């Protein structure tokens, strides 16, 4: 192996570690809902400049928020089985490097949104960053078992950001998209917390199963799933969406409710794991249904 090829491999490996700091699998779902918000905001095509700069800008700031989350929690991550392989606990990147990286990509993302999208989107995205990386990660997460419920507001913002990127305003329909993700967040994360309870207990994180027990958490998964099922019908009831969406969401909700019932009545870690994975697919499919219905409304 030549010196140049070795240097290239090392550089590529370093880039991959910084990329991992952005939690690409999580961010991809966030950005997907933001892009769908862009398309839902207009009856026709999204202006190409808004689509490109809005998507890239939101992606960069979301990646910076994820990197700050990794930075704040890296000592906890080193203890938890699910997260001990992340770059910071493994020593693949340093704390100063992570801080520099997140400031760089976050700052450039905000600059891009301000200059080439609109100031409203930039300020909303900055507020979302602060809500997730500071208010949720630093303050709420180690303080209260309701961290997911309260902090879920920041996680529900991406479709609103996408909407604002194209229209320069926030409409009632955009807030409906926010409400869907806000209602989705508790059953999604509590399913994870149930089968990862031991990990959270190790680090003293007050997740709901740790502070209130499994039965209480399972009940709340069911209750919030019912709320979600009601909320997700609202786009049809408000005539934002039509029958394609309604048919799709009723099927998706029925499956989600099935998992919630199983978690409540016949809990196993495997069921909770399956429910968590389904909840990710659920959100992606629901927003896909919104998009398809938007252009083929009847």
From Swiss-Prot:
It is an enzyme of class 2 (transferase). Pathway: Porphyrin-containing compound metabolism; heme O biosynthesis; heme O from protoheme: step 1/1. Its main location: membrane. CDD domains: PT_UbiA_Cox10. It is a multi-pass membrane protein. InterPro entries: Protohaem_IX_farnesylTrfase (IPR006369), UbiA_prenyltransferase (IPR000537), UbiA_prenylTrfase_CS (IPR030470), UbiA_sf (IPR044878). One of its GO terms (molecular function) is protoheme IX farnesyltransferase activity. Its EC number is 2.5.1.141. Carbon 2 of the heme B porphyrin ring is defined according to the Fischer nomenclature. Belongs to the UbiA prenyltransferase family. Protoheme IX farnesyltransferase subfamily. This is Protoheme IX farnesyltransferase. It comes from Nitrosomonas europaea (strain ATCC 19718 / CIP 103999 / KCTC 2705 / NBRC 14298).
